[in-house]
Protein backbone atom coordinates (compact mmCIF):
# COMPACT_ATOMS: atom_id res chain seq x y z
CA UNK A 1 0.00 0.00 0.00
CA UNK A 2 2.78 2.46 0.77
CA UNK A 3 4.19 1.57 -2.67
CA UNK A 4 1.14 3.22 -4.22
CA UNK A 5 1.52 6.27 -1.98
CA UNK A 6 5.19 6.69 -2.85
CA UNK A 7 4.89 6.21 -6.60
CA UNK A 8 2.00 8.70 -6.92
CA UNK A 9 3.00 11.16 -4.20
CA UNK A 10 4.12 14.14 -6.33
CA UNK A 11 1.68 13.82 -9.22
CA UNK A 12 -1.33 15.80 -8.04
CA UNK A 13 -3.66 12.93 -7.25
CA UNK A 14 -5.84 12.19 -4.25
CA UNK A 15 -4.36 9.08 -2.64
CA UNK A 16 -6.60 7.25 -0.18
CA UNK A 17 -5.33 4.54 2.13
CA UNK A 18 -8.32 2.45 3.24
CA UNK A 19 -7.32 1.86 6.85
CA UNK A 20 -8.09 2.87 10.43
CA UNK A 21 -7.75 6.45 11.61
CA UNK A 22 -4.23 7.36 12.71
CA UNK A 23 -2.47 5.07 10.25
CA UNK A 24 -1.60 7.94 7.92
CA UNK A 25 1.66 8.52 9.77
CA UNK A 26 2.69 4.94 9.02
CA UNK A 27 2.54 5.57 5.28
CA UNK A 28 3.81 9.13 5.29
CA UNK A 29 5.92 10.38 8.18
CA UNK A 30 7.67 7.01 8.62
CA UNK A 31 8.10 5.89 4.99
CA UNK A 32 7.76 9.10 2.98
CA UNK A 33 10.50 11.71 3.59
CA UNK A 34 8.90 14.10 1.08
CA UNK A 35 5.95 14.49 3.47
CA UNK A 36 7.76 17.22 5.40
CA UNK A 37 8.44 19.65 2.54
CA UNK A 38 6.36 18.61 -0.49
CA UNK A 39 2.63 19.33 -0.97
CA UNK A 40 0.56 16.18 -1.24
CA UNK A 41 -2.95 14.79 -1.01
CA UNK A 42 -2.54 11.55 0.91
CA UNK A 43 -5.51 10.68 3.12
CA UNK A 44 -6.59 7.86 5.39
CA UNK A 45 -10.17 6.63 5.10
CA UNK A 46 -10.71 6.30 8.85
CA UNK A 47 -12.09 2.78 8.58
CA UNK A 48 -14.05 1.95 11.74
CA UNK A 49 -15.40 -1.23 13.30
CA UNK A 50 -19.07 -0.86 12.39
CA UNK A 51 -18.37 -0.03 8.73
CA UNK A 52 -16.03 -3.00 8.55
CA UNK A 53 -18.62 -5.38 10.00
CA UNK A 54 -21.43 -4.09 7.80
CA UNK A 55 -19.32 -3.66 4.66
CA UNK A 56 -20.33 -0.01 4.37
CA UNK A 57 -18.35 1.22 1.37
CA UNK A 58 -20.72 4.10 0.70
CA UNK A 59 -19.13 6.25 3.42
CA UNK A 60 -15.75 5.81 1.72
CA UNK A 61 -17.18 6.88 -1.64
CA UNK A 62 -18.94 9.88 -0.06
CA UNK A 63 -15.79 11.00 1.79
CA UNK A 64 -13.68 10.74 -1.36
CA UNK A 65 -16.21 12.78 -3.33
CA UNK A 66 -16.15 15.46 -0.63
CA UNK A 67 -12.34 15.57 -0.63
CA UNK A 68 -12.28 15.84 -4.43
CA UNK A 69 -14.55 18.89 -4.30
CA UNK A 70 -12.22 20.55 -1.81
CA UNK A 71 -8.80 19.58 -3.20
CA UNK A 72 -9.39 19.39 -7.00
CA UNK A 73 -6.98 16.50 -7.71
CA UNK A 74 -6.02 15.20 -11.17
CA UNK A 75 -6.96 11.62 -10.28
CA UNK A 76 -7.95 9.38 -7.38
CA UNK A 77 -6.07 6.28 -6.16
CA UNK A 78 -7.37 3.92 -3.48
CA UNK A 79 -5.32 1.21 -1.80
CA UNK A 80 -6.21 -1.31 0.88
CA UNK A 81 -4.82 -2.50 4.21
CA UNK A 82 -5.10 -5.93 5.91
CA UNK A 83 -8.64 -5.42 7.24
CA UNK A 84 -10.32 -4.50 3.92
CA UNK A 85 -8.46 -7.43 2.40
CA UNK A 86 -9.74 -9.78 5.12
CA UNK A 87 -13.39 -8.80 4.54
CA UNK A 88 -13.08 -8.96 0.76
CA UNK A 89 -13.49 -5.29 -0.14
CA UNK A 90 -14.16 -4.95 -3.87
CA UNK A 91 -11.75 -2.19 -4.87
CA UNK A 92 -12.65 -2.40 -8.54
CA UNK A 93 -16.29 -1.72 -7.68
CA UNK A 94 -15.26 1.22 -5.49
CA UNK A 95 -13.07 2.44 -8.36
CA UNK A 96 -16.08 2.51 -10.69
CA UNK A 97 -18.32 4.20 -8.11
CA UNK A 98 -15.75 6.92 -7.39
CA UNK A 99 -15.03 7.50 -11.09
CA UNK A 100 -18.75 7.85 -11.83
CA UNK A 101 -19.27 10.18 -8.87
CA UNK A 102 -16.24 12.45 -9.44
CA UNK A 103 -15.60 12.18 -13.17
CA UNK A 104 -11.89 11.65 -12.46
CA UNK A 105 -9.57 8.83 -13.54
CA UNK A 106 -9.62 6.43 -10.60
CA UNK A 107 -7.44 3.53 -9.52
CA UNK A 108 -8.73 0.94 -7.08
CA UNK A 109 -5.92 -1.51 -6.33
CA UNK A 110 -6.30 -4.46 -4.00
CA UNK A 111 -3.19 -3.99 -1.92
CA UNK A 112 -3.38 -5.95 1.31
CA UNK A 113 -0.75 -4.58 3.69
CA UNK A 114 0.85 -8.04 3.76
CA UNK A 115 3.07 -7.98 0.70
CA UNK A 116 5.95 -5.58 0.09
CA UNK A 117 5.79 -2.19 -1.62
CA UNK A 118 6.73 -3.64 -5.02
CA UNK A 119 3.34 -4.87 -6.37
CA UNK A 120 1.50 -1.72 -5.24
CA UNK A 121 3.98 0.70 -6.78
CA UNK A 122 4.29 -1.47 -9.88
CA UNK A 123 0.54 -1.63 -10.41
CA UNK A 124 0.17 2.11 -9.87
CA UNK A 125 2.84 2.88 -12.45
CA UNK A 126 1.20 0.71 -15.11
CA UNK A 127 -2.17 2.31 -14.39
CA UNK A 128 -0.61 5.77 -14.76
CA UNK A 129 0.87 4.81 -18.12
CA UNK A 130 -2.38 3.31 -19.41
CA UNK A 131 -4.36 6.34 -18.26
CA UNK A 132 -2.13 9.33 -19.02
CA UNK A 133 0.72 8.51 -21.42
CA UNK A 134 0.07 9.96 -24.88
CA UNK A 135 0.92 8.44 -28.24
CA UNK A 136 4.53 9.12 -29.30
CA UNK A 137 5.44 11.79 -31.82
CA UNK A 138 8.20 9.61 -33.27
CA UNK A 139 9.54 6.08 -32.90
CA UNK A 140 12.46 5.15 -30.62
CA UNK A 141 15.89 5.59 -32.21
CA UNK A 142 19.40 4.21 -31.76
CA UNK A 143 21.77 5.26 -30.39
CA UNK A 144 19.35 6.41 -27.72
CA UNK A 145 19.09 10.10 -26.87
CA UNK A 146 15.89 10.41 -24.82
CA UNK A 147 15.67 8.56 -21.51
CA UNK A 148 12.89 7.70 -19.08
CA UNK A 149 14.01 7.03 -15.51
CA UNK A 150 11.59 4.47 -14.09
CA UNK A 151 11.17 3.41 -10.46
CA UNK A 152 12.77 6.46 -8.86
CA UNK A 153 11.11 6.82 -5.44
CA UNK A 154 12.42 7.53 -1.93
CA UNK A 155 11.60 3.96 -0.92
CA UNK A 156 14.71 2.85 -2.79
CA UNK A 157 16.70 6.08 -3.26
CA UNK A 158 15.65 8.29 -0.30
CA UNK A 159 16.07 12.08 -0.62
CA UNK A 160 19.77 12.38 0.20
CA UNK A 161 20.88 13.28 -3.34
CA UNK A 162 20.69 10.01 -5.25
CA UNK A 163 17.90 11.23 -7.54
CA UNK A 164 19.65 14.53 -8.28
CA UNK A 165 22.96 12.78 -8.96
CA UNK A 166 21.29 10.26 -11.25
CA UNK A 167 19.63 12.94 -13.34
CA UNK A 168 22.90 14.89 -13.54
CA UNK A 169 24.74 11.81 -14.81
CA UNK A 170 22.16 11.36 -17.56
CA UNK A 171 22.15 14.97 -18.76
CA UNK A 172 25.94 15.42 -18.46
CA UNK A 173 26.35 12.44 -20.79
CA UNK A 174 24.36 14.23 -23.47
CA UNK A 175 21.02 12.48 -23.01
CA UNK A 176 17.67 14.23 -22.81
CA UNK A 177 15.73 13.32 -19.68
CA UNK A 178 12.28 12.62 -21.08
CA UNK A 179 10.57 11.83 -17.77
CA UNK A 180 11.31 10.72 -14.22
CA UNK A 181 8.95 8.18 -12.62
CA UNK A 182 8.37 9.67 -10.14
CA UNK A 183 10.57 12.15 -8.28
CA UNK A 184 10.88 15.75 -9.37
CA UNK A 185 8.52 15.55 -12.33
CA UNK A 186 4.93 16.39 -13.20
CA UNK A 187 2.05 14.29 -14.45
CA UNK A 188 2.09 16.25 -17.72
CA UNK A 189 5.74 15.39 -18.30
CA UNK A 190 5.17 11.73 -17.48
CA UNK A 191 2.47 11.76 -20.15
CA UNK A 192 5.23 12.31 -22.77
CA UNK A 193 7.11 9.14 -21.77
CA UNK A 194 6.30 7.38 -25.06
CA UNK A 195 8.68 9.79 -26.83
CA UNK A 196 11.71 8.21 -25.14
CA UNK A 197 14.25 6.00 -26.90
CA UNK A 198 15.07 3.86 -23.88
CA UNK A 199 13.67 3.15 -20.42
CA UNK A 200 15.88 2.61 -17.39
CA UNK A 201 14.52 0.28 -14.71
CA UNK A 202 16.03 1.65 -11.50
CA UNK A 203 14.08 -0.58 -9.13
CA UNK A 204 11.75 -3.56 -9.25
CA UNK A 205 8.78 -1.21 -8.86
CA UNK A 206 9.21 -0.19 -12.51
CA UNK A 207 9.78 -3.53 -14.22
CA UNK A 208 6.06 -3.98 -14.93
CA UNK A 209 5.94 -0.46 -16.37
CA UNK A 210 9.00 -1.05 -18.56
CA UNK A 211 7.43 -4.18 -19.99
CA UNK A 212 4.16 -2.36 -20.65
CA UNK A 213 5.94 0.51 -22.44
CA UNK A 214 7.94 -2.00 -24.49
CA UNK A 215 4.84 -3.89 -25.60
CA UNK A 216 2.76 -0.76 -26.23
CA UNK A 217 5.28 1.69 -27.72
CA UNK A 218 8.29 -0.45 -28.63
CA UNK A 219 10.64 1.23 -26.15
CA UNK A 220 13.48 -1.08 -25.01
CA UNK A 221 14.53 -1.21 -21.37
CA UNK A 222 17.81 -1.43 -19.47
CA UNK A 223 17.90 -2.65 -15.87
CA UNK A 224 20.42 -1.21 -13.43
CA UNK A 225 21.78 1.62 -11.29
CA UNK A 226 25.10 3.39 -12.08
CA UNK A 227 27.49 2.65 -9.19
CA UNK A 228 31.16 3.62 -9.22
CA UNK A 229 33.25 5.04 -12.05
CA UNK A 230 33.30 1.95 -14.26
CA UNK A 231 29.71 1.08 -13.40
CA UNK A 232 28.56 4.54 -14.45
CA UNK A 233 30.43 4.36 -17.77
CA UNK A 234 29.07 0.88 -18.51
CA UNK A 235 25.55 1.96 -17.57
CA UNK A 236 25.65 4.96 -19.91
CA UNK A 237 26.96 2.77 -22.73
CA UNK A 238 24.10 0.32 -22.14
CA UNK A 239 21.63 3.19 -22.41
CA UNK A 240 23.08 4.41 -25.70
CA UNK A 241 22.92 0.93 -27.18
CA UNK A 242 19.55 0.04 -25.60
CA UNK A 243 21.28 -3.07 -24.26
CA UNK A 244 18.67 -5.07 -22.35
CA UNK A 245 21.27 -7.74 -21.52
CA UNK A 246 23.19 -5.34 -19.28
CA UNK A 247 23.54 -6.88 -15.77
CA UNK A 248 20.64 -9.28 -16.28
CA UNK A 249 21.34 -11.20 -19.47
CA UNK A 250 17.81 -10.35 -20.63
CA UNK A 251 16.86 -10.42 -24.28
CA UNK A 252 14.40 -7.57 -23.86
CA UNK A 253 11.59 -9.89 -24.92
CA UNK A 254 10.76 -11.32 -21.50
CA UNK A 255 7.06 -12.16 -21.21
CA UNK A 256 4.95 -9.41 -19.67
CA UNK A 257 3.81 -10.14 -16.14
CA UNK A 258 1.23 -8.28 -14.09
CA UNK A 259 1.75 -6.78 -10.65
CA UNK A 260 -1.50 -8.38 -9.50
CA UNK A 261 0.01 -11.84 -9.91
CA UNK A 262 2.44 -11.13 -7.07
CA UNK A 263 -0.49 -10.38 -4.76
CA UNK A 264 -2.13 -13.68 -5.61
CA UNK A 265 0.65 -15.58 -3.82
CA UNK A 266 -0.18 -15.40 -0.12
CA UNK A 267 2.92 -17.31 1.01
CA UNK A 268 5.10 -14.51 2.30
CA UNK A 269 7.51 -16.90 4.03
CA UNK A 270 9.64 -18.19 1.22
CA UNK A 271 13.09 -19.64 0.84
CA UNK A 272 14.62 -20.40 -2.53
CA UNK A 273 18.11 -21.54 -1.64
CA UNK A 274 20.85 -20.55 -4.07
CA UNK A 275 24.09 -21.04 -2.12
CA UNK A 276 25.80 -23.84 -0.23
CA UNK A 277 27.18 -23.67 3.31
CA UNK A 278 30.65 -22.45 2.35
CA UNK A 279 31.69 -18.95 3.49
CA UNK A 280 31.71 -15.98 1.12
CA UNK A 281 33.42 -12.60 1.05
CA UNK A 282 30.35 -10.38 0.84
CA UNK A 283 26.60 -10.88 1.20
CA UNK A 284 24.34 -8.08 -0.05
CA UNK A 285 20.69 -7.91 1.06
CA UNK A 286 18.06 -5.76 -0.60
CA UNK A 287 15.86 -5.09 -3.62
CA UNK A 288 16.73 -7.01 -6.83
CA UNK A 289 17.87 -4.17 -9.15
CA UNK A 290 20.01 -2.71 -6.38
CA UNK A 291 21.47 -6.17 -5.73
CA UNK A 292 22.42 -6.79 -9.36
CA UNK A 293 23.99 -3.33 -9.61
CA UNK A 294 25.88 -3.72 -6.35
CA UNK A 295 27.28 -7.11 -7.36
CA UNK A 296 28.64 -5.71 -10.63
CA UNK A 297 30.13 -2.78 -8.73
CA UNK A 298 31.85 -4.95 -6.10
CA UNK A 299 33.22 -7.38 -8.67
CA UNK A 300 34.29 -5.03 -11.44
CA UNK A 301 35.24 -1.94 -9.47
CA UNK A 302 36.61 -3.42 -6.24
CA UNK A 303 37.75 -6.84 -7.43
CA UNK A 304 35.62 -8.92 -5.04
CA UNK A 305 34.76 -12.14 -6.83
CA UNK A 306 32.80 -13.99 -4.13
CA UNK A 307 29.65 -11.86 -3.81
CA UNK A 308 26.28 -13.34 -2.88
CA UNK A 309 22.87 -11.73 -3.22
CA UNK A 310 19.87 -12.23 -0.95
CA UNK A 311 16.46 -10.73 -1.69
CA UNK A 312 13.86 -10.77 1.12
CA UNK A 313 11.14 -9.57 -1.28
CA UNK A 314 9.55 -12.76 -2.59
CA UNK A 315 6.92 -10.76 -4.48
CA UNK A 316 9.45 -9.04 -6.75
CA UNK A 317 9.09 -9.66 -10.51
CA UNK A 318 10.30 -13.22 -11.02
CA UNK A 319 12.52 -12.29 -13.98
CA UNK A 320 14.70 -10.24 -11.63
CA UNK A 321 15.17 -13.00 -9.04
CA UNK A 322 16.99 -15.55 -11.16
CA UNK A 323 20.53 -14.58 -10.06
CA UNK A 324 19.97 -14.46 -6.29
CA UNK A 325 18.67 -16.28 -3.26
CA UNK A 326 15.16 -15.40 -2.14
CA UNK A 327 14.56 -15.68 1.60
CA UNK A 328 12.08 -13.92 3.85
CA UNK A 329 12.44 -16.30 6.81
CA UNK A 330 14.49 -14.72 9.58
CA UNK A 331 16.43 -17.86 10.51
CA UNK A 332 17.51 -18.41 6.91
CA UNK A 333 18.68 -14.81 6.57
CA UNK A 334 20.60 -15.16 9.84
CA UNK A 335 22.39 -18.25 8.55
CA UNK A 336 23.35 -16.52 5.31
CA UNK A 337 24.67 -13.51 7.22
CA UNK A 338 26.72 -15.79 9.44
CA UNK A 339 28.48 -17.34 6.41
CA UNK A 340 29.66 -13.99 5.03
CA UNK A 341 32.78 -12.11 6.06
CA UNK A 342 30.99 -8.79 5.37
CA UNK A 343 27.28 -8.03 4.99
CA UNK A 344 26.01 -4.97 3.12
CA UNK A 345 22.44 -4.36 4.26
CA UNK A 346 20.00 -2.17 6.12
CA UNK A 347 21.34 -1.81 9.69
CA UNK A 348 18.31 -3.57 11.15
CA UNK A 349 19.76 -6.84 9.84
CA UNK A 350 22.70 -6.46 12.22
CA UNK A 351 20.31 -7.41 15.02
CA UNK A 352 20.26 -10.95 13.64
CA UNK A 353 23.88 -11.40 14.73
CA UNK A 354 24.42 -9.20 17.80
CA UNK A 355 27.86 -10.72 18.41
CA UNK A 356 29.04 -10.04 14.85
CA UNK A 357 27.90 -6.45 14.29
CA UNK A 358 31.32 -5.39 13.01
CA UNK A 359 30.84 -7.40 9.82
CA UNK A 360 27.84 -5.28 8.76
CA UNK A 361 28.15 -2.30 6.42
CA UNK A 362 25.17 -0.02 6.92
CA UNK A 363 23.18 0.74 3.74
CA UNK A 364 19.81 1.98 5.04
CA UNK A 365 16.79 1.15 2.88
CA UNK A 366 13.86 3.52 3.37
CA UNK A 367 11.38 0.82 2.34
CA UNK A 368 12.66 -1.44 5.11
CA UNK A 369 13.57 0.70 8.12
CA UNK A 370 11.72 3.91 7.23
CA UNK A 371 13.13 7.10 8.69
CA UNK A 372 15.12 5.43 11.49
CA UNK A 373 18.51 5.56 9.74
CA UNK A 374 17.84 8.39 7.33
CA UNK A 375 20.88 10.37 8.47
CA UNK A 376 23.19 7.46 7.59
CA UNK A 377 21.99 7.01 4.00
CA UNK A 378 24.81 7.54 1.47
CA UNK A 379 24.74 8.66 -2.13
CA UNK A 380 25.31 5.30 -3.81
CA UNK A 381 24.74 6.55 -7.36
CA UNK A 382 27.68 7.63 -9.50
CA UNK A 383 31.50 7.52 -9.44
CA UNK A 384 31.92 8.91 -5.90
CA UNK A 385 30.45 5.75 -4.37
CA UNK A 386 33.73 3.89 -4.93
CA UNK A 387 35.66 5.84 -2.30
CA UNK A 388 32.83 5.53 0.22
CA UNK A 389 32.57 1.76 -0.16
CA UNK A 390 36.35 1.22 -0.05
CA UNK A 391 36.47 3.04 3.27
CA UNK A 392 33.60 1.00 4.69
CA UNK A 393 35.12 -2.30 3.58
CA UNK A 394 38.33 -1.48 5.43
CA UNK A 395 36.49 -0.74 8.69
CA UNK A 396 35.37 -3.38 11.17
CA UNK A 397 36.60 -6.80 10.16
CA UNK A 398 37.98 -5.62 6.81
CA UNK A 399 38.33 -7.99 3.88
What kind of feature is each model-predicted range?
Residues 1-399:
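An N-terminal assembly and electron-transfer interface module characteristic of large anaerobic redox
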